[in-house]
Design a protein with these regions (language model features):
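Hydrophobic alpha-helical connector segments
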Residues: 1-32, 69, 77-84
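Short, flexible helix-adjacent loops and helix caps
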Residues: 4-7, 39, 43, 68, ...
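A structural signal for alpha-helical segments
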Residues: 8-12, 47, 72, 109
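Short alpha-helical scaffolding segments that buttress acidic/His motifs in well-ordered protein cores
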Residues: 20, 34-37, 84, 88, ...
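Short secondary-structure transition hinges
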Residues: 22-64, 79, 106-112
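C-terminal peripheral helix-coil segments that are non-catalytic and often amphipathic
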Residues: 26, 57-69, 73, 87-134
Length: 134
């Protein structure tokens, strides 16, 4: 898991976005499948997450350490992860709609958009984590 790798949290954001976009881009129906399976058997996915070593408490400790060092604004892991994953997954899950309304159905242009979006999502999350809240 990327969050357990060495280095600053802000650097990990780039790697997370890149990895998720790459995986989902190669498996475009994965978001719909996972959402369906999570709704069908949520306990199964809790077990899978627990067995895979994903530990929300560890992530919160990483976040808290970065906050204490003055590197990021305070945030809960329960807010960061859904924000990050939602920004990554939604353009894939809603592709038929977004490709039609924003790109007149042009698949190549939408693929370009998805690829460029990697940097935008990383920058957006990093800015939210480091910008002084109003």
């Amino acid at each position: 898991m990327i969050f357990k790798e060495e280095g600053p949290l802000l650097d990990k954001i780039d790697r997370i976005v890149d990895r998720y976009v790459t995986v989902i881009g190669g498996n475009p129906f994965l978001p719909q499948f996972l959402i369906g399976e999570i709704n069908r058997d949520p306990e199964k996915f809790v077990r899978i997450l627990q067995n895979s070593g994903i530990d929300p408490n560890f992530l919160q400790r990483v976040i808290d350490k970065e906050v204490e060092a003055g590197n990021i604004n305070p945030i809960q892991a329960a807010d960061l992860i859904p924000n990050l994953i939602g920004m990554i997954i939604m353009p894939f899950a809603a592709r038929p709609l977004f490709q039609t309304i924003f790109f007149q159905g042009d698949r190549e242009k939408y693929d370009e958009y998805l690829n460029k979006r990697r940097k935008m999502v990383s920058a957006f999350i990093k800015q939210a984590l480091t910008r002084n809240p109003a």
